[in-house]
Amino acid sequence: MRLKGGVVMKKRNRILSLLLAGVMALGLTACGASNAGAAADETGSAAVSTESASSDTAASGEKIINVGVTNTIGSINPLLLNGGEINKYATGLMFLPLMELDADLNFEGMLADSITTEDNKNFIVHIDDAATWSDGTPVTADDVVYTALRLASPVIGNTAMMYYVFEGVGDDGFVEEGAESIDGIQKVDDKTVQFTTKEEMPITTFENSYARYLLTLPKHVIEQYSEEELSTADWFNHPDVVSGPFIVTDFDVDHYISYEANKDYWKGAPKIDKLNIKIVDGSQLYAGLQSGEIDITQQTMSDIPQEDYESVEALDNVDVVYGSPVTNQSVFIQTKNVPDVKVRQAMLYAIDRQQILEELLNGHGEIVDGFLSSASPFYDDSLTPVSYDPEKAKALLEEAGWDGSQTIRFYVNSGDSTFVNAASIIAAEWAAVGIKAEIQTVDFATLMSVAGTEDYDVLAVQYTYAPVDPYPDVAWLLGGEGSWTGYSDDTLNDALTKSQLTSDPEETKELFSVVDKKVQEDVPMFSAYVISAQGAVSKRITGAAPSVYGFFNDVQNWDVVE
């Protein structure tokens, strides 16, 4: 899906808004560290109050599970949803998405039971016939269409949903103010909705970028509110009609969210009575798991510090699960400022990435070149990562006429202690071959501000590329002028374009292999390592397992056995 002409920057900016939301709030541990650090100063009193409440109710015989996370939650209003997984998961416990990925990266029906297309432009969404609201009213196509219309409202102004892809929506992602319908999102019958896109897209892109993020609202309840009121209506703070397994009872978006079971959940009443999401600093997760105040953590929402991994593994009361490698410690090179490909190649050859993985992450991860890891079905395992070869690096620098006078400005997130250490190793290895680097350690907000300029040479951030749908991220990051790399290539662009015109997994794999090989060759970015993050679950819990995707899909089956 190529973006052309005057629309390009509008669409790029829309993509960037979603990507930044994802980088800042998704399970990216860089963000988790910075957010958690900010929240930690205030966490104490809130944590005490929710813990004491949990103890009282547990004593009365209620079953309660506490989930520990390190990312703050912006809002629980589905119309204000950003690209972050914690935001989506916390809200999706009440308002189901149409589809969700499961632990094996298959799309699983949540509110919908099928999504089909014959032409990659018209997507037919069928709502599960059994789906009902907690007040007994059936979930219908009217609810889905109404929610989509409001998500595209310029009055509400959600900047993350990228609805510009649908017919009838402007290139800014919004409909006209006061619009009563969207041409590209139409009711077919009571349980069927047709979504029509302006250009072809693979069904996986539709499912991953749109079906997973459309959290349907009950039209019959909230149509009483004007568009202006929907952003601030108090109803969203304590909704009384939901489609999901839980209903929020209390929350502080910086500290906790408390839920009670929806006993009328149409997929089956939850086995537990209450669920709490506790937002804590990463350094508090080990103590919480040890004491039993936290029952479960998830690999991307719960940033257990690397230095605590062995301690968590040693706990007798929890089982540890390492997630699939999805969080890519990406290092972006601004090619405008480092234009010689041989210099960029030398920068990669000079780094002993395997040693960094073993020493700083205890081997919990992998080394890849490009964007895709072994977690993706499109990963090409025949692509051998560039090996550590400082002599090759020196030779390339000599061929490039590198005189060592330029100092590489290397921006790093101060909240990611592991990569702060890795950056020091990288800078030393660069120095050993004749590349001077000055590490600029800044907070995450500053890092993102710098990323929006070209005033850097190298910038590192943890980034999760959706394994089943990497296109939006890759297309932006290699989008030429204005992107984090400033890099563009015709062969690569052609492969990306073709990836949007096929639904054949093998062809898609071949096309993304072209992309990763070109990235390996030209080095506009490189992966320092890909993290297999740690999750843990109390042995008193059944039916629950930490997983990168699908964590809450069957939360109604979670149970307490003690």
Model-flagged regions — what are they?
Residues 350-378, 418-425, 449-562:
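Detector for C-terminal structural segments
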